[in-house]
Amino acid sequence: MMAARRINSAGLVLIQSFEGLRLTAYRCPAGVWTIGYGHTGPDVNPGQRITPAEAEALLRGDLDRFESGVAAAVGNAPTTDNQFAAMVSLAFNIGLGAL
């Protein structure tokens, strides 16, 4: 069995730069409570604060779903690590269903 394909460090930095780091929860333009590098969900509450390390852990956890989804969509098609990272970044931004 092949190991799960993961985003490379350049892709991680790309997502972090696009999302920006917010250590205090805020409402995004869509009205959703958000923290860290674009993390949303029932675990984000008004006034919540996190550390940079916690923000990175949340992002890595969030990316699991997108890495798996992109890997499934790509299948055996040859892609470079940077191409895969770009697709994960896009999926993180617009959602897997929009790919």
Label the model's feature ranges.
Residues M1-L99:
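Cell-wall polysaccharide-cleaving catalytic domain and substrate-binding groove, primarily
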